[in-house]
From Swiss-Prot:
InterPro entries: Gln-synt_C, Gln_synt_N, Gln_synth/guanido_kin_cat_dom, Gln_synth_cat_dom, Gln_synth_gly_rich_site, GS_Type-3, GSIII_N. Keywords: ATP-binding, Cytoplasm, Ligase, Magnesium, Metal-binding, Nucleotide-binding. Its EC number is 6.3.1.2. Gene3D superfamilies: 1.20.120.1560, Glutamine synthetase/guanido kinase, catalytic domain (3.30.590.10). It comes from Bacteroides fragilis (strain YCH46). Homohexamer. Its cofactor is Mg(2+). The gene is glnA. One of its GO terms (biological process) is glutamine biosynthetic process. Pfam families: Gln-synt_C (PF00120), Gln-synt_C-ter (PF18318), GSIII_N (PF12437). This is Glutamine synthetase. Catalyzes the ATP-dependent biosynthesis of glutamine from glutamate and ammonia. It comes from the Bacteria.
Length: 729
């Protein structure tokens, strides 16, 4: 292995940036060239077929089989112009990745001749094996049938020579087995609930859309070094490795000059993204060495999520051409920042109003305040659900590590906006408001745009921060599917808005005027949600203590956090808003707990193998060299000189012996703990056992190995070190 390490470093020194040529000097010449968007539809579809797609997208009108055949034929004709040979239903199973099965257009005609055919039936529905994907026990191996069904709202696209059709994935009995199905339901739920609240202010509003802008963080590592680290290859993170003398402490990497090889990778990635209609806009160095970020312009939430999954696939594929491996793990290296995926979330009406941006008059600001306060209440009531939606084995290393938001959910608004809410509480009473009181209150609300213009600061320690015209959910992990967080947020928001509307309606039925009813319910919600508002340092110990006093939960135990998917409040949201049924929700919990168990199990096995078969032999070999050196010294020096000059070596031999013995014992005990955990039949008990009895060994074993790394001759250490992984360009 040590030879492999030095061969990797030698190979790395010969790397050169690839030459990247853009298809055209004008981005507009090739932007979305590989997407079957409306412009292409108008060209390739009959008018009635084009109208059927538009009606299905905007109104939810079903597409007839006759229209589906016309659409499929037009889609195939367009795809053939790009030399496409295959098609696939592209879907997002519960694996934090995408899935696809490629079929050729080739069929035999009645006379035995080969023809190319793509029918409406093939476009609309296919049958992959549902038992081979995570399904939480919904499908047995002998009950393999599942269905993929076309998502009309997300346009088909071409990658290489394959036509990819975005689809949902459901079981034979109709249960969702993917991320897209519940996401579409959550978006529909928040659309309906938000529209009803909006119509208290403006009857012209008939739809509310959810927008998402994601920020994808990632690490790059040269493939030669990556291949020399079995832990990186098999788990996505380094299970051992002493920190480099220099890491991120000089703060010289963030927004620094991008290395030429990385720039070439980013250029090619952007070209491929733009061909697929993905509006990537920003690229830069992140805080940690060899860490970077890619961010697009925000889009409709469903499409934005599809694009993020597609980008992650593209990054892996393109990185290989540039001799890089992309690391999406939330914490690939100890001691430096991990990677997140900030979700910038907003709601916009079909009349062009951003509901999270102040209006141009008091009425518009009332609408803004109504949605702002409902977000506060939504997060306050559903903090455990939001945490569960982003909790994973990888993300647990990052949350609360003074680099990412803590596991405590709170909202940052900025002091001025918080003061405005406090003023509403002070001015609104339970008695009937006078016209003068209403005017004073509305005038104060009218000043909100002036307040936010210069005083909406950024608090990087807040997990859910208001940033002027959107909320930024910063707790999501870099490897996650955005849909998990977006399902939770939008379903919870729909639930909260429905409750708000019902409360306002009740007061109006009692004879209270609409404006006053809204003010009263807003006041109640501002008071009730006050514990969730926090303007200070989310990393501090003081905040943990203060959060506990406020009654906020702080759950770092992964299985315990995931269990809140099925607590009473989460069920009221996810089942109450018809995002999941009972079976589907139980399935989600089982899948997440099993994923956690398997990831810790793999890490444990990999670390045990590396420790016993790679590190211990090297340590013993070096120890033997030291012992041989002692024997030679004893032959040369006098006994007195020998005792003085050999003391440090004897101490080192003793230290290595202690570390090697400890590693062997810990690996043995970890293996036994794993066996006990594996015999637990209940998936919940197994996950808890892995968290509490297996996972702690990973850090203990690592600690001994990291000490050995600093004590053993660099020439024989088998694995690439942090200084090589992080500082080779």
């Amino acid at each position: 292995m040590s030879k492999m390490r030095f061969f990797a470093l030698q190979e790395l020194s010969n790397r050169k940036p690839l030459e990247i040529t853009t298809p055209s000097n004008k981005l507009s010449d090739y932007y979305a060239s590989h997407v079957f968007d409306r412009k292409k539809m108008q060209e390739y579809l009959p008018k009635e077929a084009y109208k059927a797609v538009v009606d299905a997208t905007e109104k939810g009108t079903p597409i007839s089989r006759e229209m589906a055949d016309l659409i499929a034929n037009g889609m195939k004709s367009w795809a053939k112009s790009l030399n496409v040979t295959h098609y696939t239903h592209w879907f997002q199973p519960l694996t934090d990745g995408t899935a696809e099965k490629h079929d050729g257009f080739i069929e035999f005609g009645e006379d035995g001749e080969v023809i190319e055919r793509f029918s409406g039936k093939l476009l609309i529905q296919q049958e992959p094996d549902a038992s081979s994907f995570p399904n939480g026990g919904i499908r047995n191996t002998f009950e393999a049938r599942g269905y993929t069904a076309w998502d009309v709202s997300s346009p088909a696209f071409v990658v290489d020579t394959t036509l990819c059709i975005p689809t949902i994935f459901i079981s034979y009995t109709g249960e969702a087995l993917d991320y897209k199905t519940p996401l579409l339901k959550a978006l529909a739920a928040v659309d309906k609930a938000a529209t009803e609240v909006c119509q208290l202010f403006d009857k012209n509003i008939t739809r509310v859309f959810t927008n998402l802008g994601w920020e994808q963080e990632y690490f790059l590592v040269d493939t030669s070094l990556y291949n020399a680290r079995p832990d990186l290859r098999l788990t996505g993170r380094t299970l051992m490795g002493h920190s480099s003398a220099k890491d991120q402490q000089l703060e010289d990497h963030y927004f620094g000059s991008i290395p030429p090889r990385v720039t070439a990778f980013m250029k090619e990635l952007e070209i491929e993204c733009h061909k697929l209609g993905i509006p990537v806009k920003t690229r830069h160095n992140e805080v940690a060495p060899n860490q970077f970020e890619l961010a697009p312009i925000f889009e409709n939430c469903n499409l934005a999520n599809d694009h993020n999954q597609l980008v992650m696939d593209l990054m892996k594929r393109i990185a290989r051409k540039h001799h890089f491996a992309v690391l999406f793990h939330e914490k690939p290296y100890n001691g430096v920042n991990g990677s997140g995926k900030h979700n910038n979330w907003s709601l916009c009406t079909d009349t062009g109003i951003n509901l999270f941006a102040p209006g141009k008059n008091p009425k518009g600001n009332m609408l803004f305040l109504t949605f702002l306060v409902n977000v506060l209440m939504m997060v306050h009531k559903n903090q455990d659900l939001l945490r569960a939606s982003i909790m994973s084995a990888g993300n647990s290393h990052r949350l609360g590590a003074n680099e990412a938001p803590p596991a405590i959910l709170s909202i940052f608004l900025g002091s001025q906006l918080s003061a405005t809410l406090d003023e509403i509480v002070r001015q609104v009473t339970n008695s009937k408001m006078t016209p003068e009181e209403k005017t004073t209150l509305k005038l104060g609300i009218g000043r909100i745009p002036e307040i936010l213009l210069d005083t909406t600061d950024r608090n990087r320690t807040s997990p859910f921060a208001f940033t002027g015209n959107r909320f930024e959910f910063r707790a999501a992990g870099s490897s996650a599917n955005c849909a998990a967080a977006m399902i939770a947020i939008n379903a919870a928001m729909a639930n909260q808005l429905n409750e708000f509307k019902a409360s306002v309606d009740k007061l109006m039925e009692e004879g209270i005027g609409k404006d006053e009813a809204i003010f009263r319910i807003l006041k109640e919600n501002i008071i009730a949600s006050e514990p969730i508002r926090f303007e200070g340092d989310g990393y501090s110990e003081e905040w943990k203590q203060e959060a506990a006093r406020r009654g906020l939960t702080n759950i770092c135990h992964v299985p315990e956090a995931l269990m809140h998917y099925t607590d009473n409040q989460s069920r009221a949201v996810l089942i109450g808003e018809r995002i999941f049924n009972e079976t589907e929700l139980a399935c989600r919990l089982e899948v997440e707990l099993e994923k956690y168990t398997m990831k810790v199990q793999i890490e444990s096995r990999v670390l045990g193998d590396l420790a016993i078969n790679h590190i211990v032999p090297i340590a013993v070999s070096y120890q033997n060299r030291l012992l041989e050196n002692l024997c030679r010294m004893k032959e040369i020096f006098s006994e007195e000189e020998y005792e003085v000059m050999s003391a440090d070596r004897k101490e080192l031999i003793k230290e290595i012996s202690h570390r090697v013995s400890a590693i062997k014992v810990l690996v043995r005990d970890m293996t036994e703990a794993r066996k006990v955990a594996n015999h637990k039949e209940n998936f919940k008990e197994k996950a808890f056992a892995y968290e509490e009895t297996v996972r702690p060994y990973l850090e203990s074993i690592r600690d001994h190995i990291d000490h050995l790394e600093m004590e053993i001759d660099d020439e024989i250490w088998p694995l690439p070190k942090y200084r090589e992984l992080l500082f080779t360009k």
